[in-house]
Swiss-Prot record:
Required for normal Golgi function. It is a peripheral membrane protein. This is Conserved oligomeric Golgi complex subunit 6. The keyword S-adenosyl-L-methionine does not apply. SMART domains: COG6. Belongs to the COG6 family. Pfam families: COG6_C, COG6_N. It comes from Caenorhabditis elegans.
Length: 642
């Protein structure tokens, strides 16, 4: 066993443990036995007993020595490593010292850097906040790329879409919000955005104006999608007066041409129909009906896309294109029409539609003014036609016929009057081309004058009166239903009354002469009321003379009662009522004369006591019986003549 100095043992505790283990009796030590069991595999055929203790001890010493050598070798290596490590530690110490100094330096720098970093973080947070605010502002107060692209596409394609108007609504919303921000906060960015939105708005207005004319073409009441787009377009551009007026002008131009084309097509179809333009009245009515329908459609169409306050002006301007073609067409039709009644109807149609268009458009529109001018023209043509027709009839009027009835020209003139006045009656209280008074003035006044002039060709006053009464009676019957002609009827009645006076005077004189009492009446009437002598003593009024006259009167009355009066002049009077009135007047006047004679005969002072004469009541009853007997056949005859 090698000698190991105490210093080494003290230094190496492992060696001390090995030495202690070798000094013990290993076979009695339980721990050693465990170790022996552990190292037994290392020794072949060796049993742990007292005999082998020495051998084992030697072997262990050798093993220990070898281990010590190995330990020494390894320890030298470790020592070398430790020495190197020590050198490294020295170097590391130096390095750490340097690092410590540098760290102190860096520490001061880091503190400054941290302070700067904190400041930068604050600035970064502020910048990020501002950036977020800017991004949020730009997001809320600017148009997206898609929206800007939509504006470009609409500008290039020329078609407006729903999305286009959504973009414009957003543009207006942004501009209004920016305006509020500028007014309330003085926001400069909002002012710039507002100016930008203003430019976009102006650009969009230009796009709308450039595309409206295309949208207006082929626009109908059923074009619902187009109407929605145009309604939004007008709503947007209404804020810009100049652009809005330009759009209105474009609408008027486009729709005027469209209305003109439709009007031309309607006229082409009317010309191609079998009757063509052979019926001017129907042609004018159809044209006005078509124009009224087109105007109604145009009114409905414009009301659906724009405000109603511009409607009258727009309709007026749109219909302006139809005024000249319609006026020319009506004047052409008017130039070919000669019938005054048809012209009168045409004028009333024009007046009727003029009133309708005043309500539909406005009072002083181009179309209503044109219709008013046409009405004046038609009125002049109608008056000229009536005058020409009446003058022609008056020139052709022949002398009265033997029956003293109205000549055919009178009937034709009254037919013209009936045609005109019936239209006036049907029209009622509406405006007329000619009022009933004017119709009377242009038709019946010349007729009455010509009738009076034509009657002068007759030989006797009775024939003149009968013919005049017949004509005036027919005229009065024609105007009797018109309340406006009350004074005219009174005037005609006065003229009939005047001619009836002549007729009654002549007839009564003739009856008195035929009855034989005319001379007696004249003599009685010629006696001076102051005469005191009896009338029977006067020459020509003797009882015998008066008696003969009374007998002659009685015979006349008998013959008169039995006569059918076929050849009486009053039988030629057309109207049974007038004829009966004249007969009643004849009877009344005749009875007045006879009553005066009877009064003279019945006066005792006149000396006619023994003279027999018919009582007045008897004569009156005989004459009334005649009247009743003739009433029925006369009425039938009057109806047949009428």
């Amino acid at each position: 066993m090698s000698v190991i100095d105490k210093t080494s043992s003290a230094v190496n505790p492992l060696r001390e443990k090995v030495t202690t283990a070798c000094a013990k009796k290993l076979y009695n030590d339980k721990d050693c036995i465990k170790i022996a069991d552990f190292i037994t595999p290392l020794v072949e055929d060796m049993n742990l007993d007292s005999n082998v203790d020495r051998k084992l001890h030697n072997k262990l010493e050798r093993y220990e020595l070898r281990l010590n050598k190995e330990y020494l070798s390894e320890f030298e290596k470790i020592n070398n490593i430790v020495q190197k490590f020590d050198e490294l530690c020295v170097k590391m110490n130096s390095t750490c010292t340097n690092l410590s100094k540098q760290m102190e330096t860096v520490k001061f720098k880091s503190v400054d850097l941290v302070q700067k970093t904190a400041s930068l973080k604050e600035k970064k947070a502020s910048i990020e906040s501002r950036c977020n605010m800017i991004n949020e502002f730009l997001e809320n107060y600017s148009l997206s790329s898609e929206e800007l692209r939509e504006l470009d596409e609409c500008e290039q394609s020329g078609h407006l879409s729903e999305f286009f108007f959504k973009v414009l609504e957003r543009c207006h919303e942004i501009r209004e919000n920016c305006r509020n921000m500028v007014q309330e906060q003085g926001h400069l960015a909002a002012f710039e955005v507002m100016e930008k939105m203003q430019k976009i708005d102006e650009r969009s207005h230009a796009i709308i104006c450039n595309n409206l004319k295309r949208e207006f073409q082929n626009l109908t009441v059923d074009s619902h999608q187009k109407k929605q787009i145009l309604s939004k377009a007008f709503k947007i551009i209404s804020q810009n007066d100049a652009v809005f007026q330009l759009a209105i002008d474009q609408y008027i131009s486009s729709r005027s041409q469209e209305l003109l084309n439709q009007f031309v097509e309607i006229n082409k179809m009317a010309v191609q129909m079998p009757e063509g333009l052979a019926e001017p009245l129907k042609a004018v009515g159809d044209m006005l009906t078509s124009i009224h329908e087109l105007t109604e459609q145009e009114k409905q169409l414009f009301s659906s896309i724009c405000s109603a306050e511009n409607l009258p002006i727009v309709l007026d301007e749109c219909l302006k294109s139809l005024t000249s073609p319609f006026k020319i067409r009506v004047e052409q039709l008017l130039s070919t029409e000669k019938n005054a009644i048809t012209i009168f109807k045409m004028g009333n149609i024009l007046i009727f539609y003029a009133n309708k268009f005043e309500t539909l458009i406005r009072k002083d529109s181009y179309f209503t003014i044109m219709l008013a001018d046409l009405v004046k023209t038609v009125r002049q043509v109608c008056i000229a036609g009536i005058n020409h027709h009446v003058d022609g009839l008056m020139r052709k009027m022949t002398s009265p016929h033997y029956d003293l009835l109205p000549v055919p020209e009178v009937r034709q003139c009254l037919s013209l009057y009936h045609g005109l006045i019936s239209i006036a009656v049907k029209t009622g209280d509406l405006n007329l081309l000619l009022e009933p008074e004017r119709i009377y003035e242009y038709v019946l006044e010349p007729l009455i004058q010509t009738v009076q002039l034509s009657a002068t060709r007759l030989k006797s006053d009775i024939e003149v009166s009968v013919f005049t009464i017949n004509c005036l009676t027919v005229i009065r019957s024609a105007i009797s239903e018109i309340s406006a002609f009350k004074k005219k009827i009174e005037m005609i009645d006065a003229m009939i009354e005047g001619n009836s006076d002549v007729l009654v005077s002549v007839q009564v004189s003739e009856m008195l002469e035929k009855s034989g009492i005319l001379e007696l009446y004249q003599k009685f009437n010629a006696v001076n009321p102051a005469e005191k002598k009896p009338l029977s003593t006067l020459p020509g009024l003797e009882s015998t003379t008066v008696g003969e006259a009374i007998v002659m009167f009685t015979q006349y009355l008998h013959n008169h009662a039995s006569s059918d009066h076929t050849y009486d002049i009053d039988q030629q009077i057309l109207a049974s009522e007038e004829r009966q009135r004249i007969r009643e007047r004849n009877t009344l006047e005749f009875l007045k004369v006879y009553k005066m004679i009877v009064d003279r005969l019945g006066n005792p002072t006149n000396g006619y006591e023994n003279l027999h004469y018919l009582p007045i009541e008897h004569v009156e009853s005989v004459l009334k019986f005649e009247k009743e007997k003739e009433n029925t056949p006369s009425s039938n005859e009057s109806e047949s003549l009428a």
